[in-house]
Amino acid sequence: MTKLLVGLGNPGDKYFETKHNVGFMLIDQLAKKQNVTFTHDKIFQADLASFFLNGEKIYLVKPTTFMNESGKAVHALLTYYGLDIDDLLIIYDDLDMEVGKIRLRAKGSAGGHNGIKSIIQHIGTQVFNRVKIGIGRPKNGMSVVHHVLSKFDRDEYIGILQSVDKVDDSVNYYLQEKNFEKTMQRYNG
């Protein structure tokens, strides 16, 4: 069996640790814990790392297509490896949740998130496992674009680091249990 764990974000130093790159931050954390490094794959338009866990190959994926085209990389990888939608887990930021809150879902709309919208368009379904990490709404009249492309302030960053640990725990639990429904019951709350 093979699993794809995909963190959404934008490539490049300009976007490093911005709110929209929470998915990349989590995937980087998982790679660090597994002591694996990323290599860029031009065909898949993604940075990839992999490891084995309980006999399963786990791919850590950071699409390099920029957020709004993330579905291209996800679709290419699913197709190439002949994977089912159940083998996919997407990790991304959510404006409508408080900073640092997490929510696991097995289906749903894009909710205004262009990366998720792209994935839904490319794979043809809204039914796929996902972990949402809250980044909060813009404050003081700030535009959504400016908000998601800005860095966290100190207090927000502390909350995000705590959520990254919780998401890391939930992803590891999911990989061990091989049951997303059970993982949602344990970590949503």
Swiss-Prot record:
Question: Main EC class of this protein?
Answer: hydrolase
* Keyword hit for Ribosomal protein: no
Record-level Gene Ontology MF annotations: peptidyl-tRNA hydrolase activity; tRNA binding
Q: Where in the cell is it found?
A: Cytoplasm
Catalytic reactions of this protein: an N-acyl-L-alpha-aminoacyl-tRNA + H2O = an N-acyl-L-amino acid + a tRNA + H(+)
Query: Which residues does this entry assign to the site Stabilizes the basic form of H active site to accept a proton?
Result: 93
The transmembrane residues are none
User: Gene3D superfamilies per the record?
Assistant: Peptidyl-tRNA hydrolase (3.40.50.1470)
Q: Where is this site: Discriminates between blocked and unblocked aminoacyl-tRNA?
A: 10
Identify the GO cellular component terms for this protein. cytoplasm
Key words, A-Z: Cytoplasm, Hydrolase, RNA-binding, tRNA-binding
The parts of the chain that form a coiled coil are none
Biological process, per Gene Ontology: protein quality control for misfolded or incompletely synthesized proteins; rescue of stalled ribosome
- Taxonomically, the superkingdom here is Bacteria
- Known EC number(s)? 3.1.1.29
Q: Does the keyword Transmembrane apply?
A: no
Q: Where is the active site?
A: 20 (proton acceptor)
Task: Identify the residues that bind tRNA.
Answer: 15, 66, 68, 114
Please explain the role this protein plays, according to its UniProt record: Hydrolyzes ribosome-free peptidyl-tRNAs (with 1 or more amino acids incorporated), which drop off the ribosome during protein synthesis, or as a result of ribosome stalling.
* Family that this chain belongs to: Belongs to the PTH family.
Quaternary organization: Monomer.
- Please state what the protein is called: Peptidyl-tRNA hydrolase
The taxonomic lineage of its organism, from the top, reads: Bacteria, Bacillati, Bacillota, Bacilli, Lactobacillales
Tell me what gene encodes this: pth
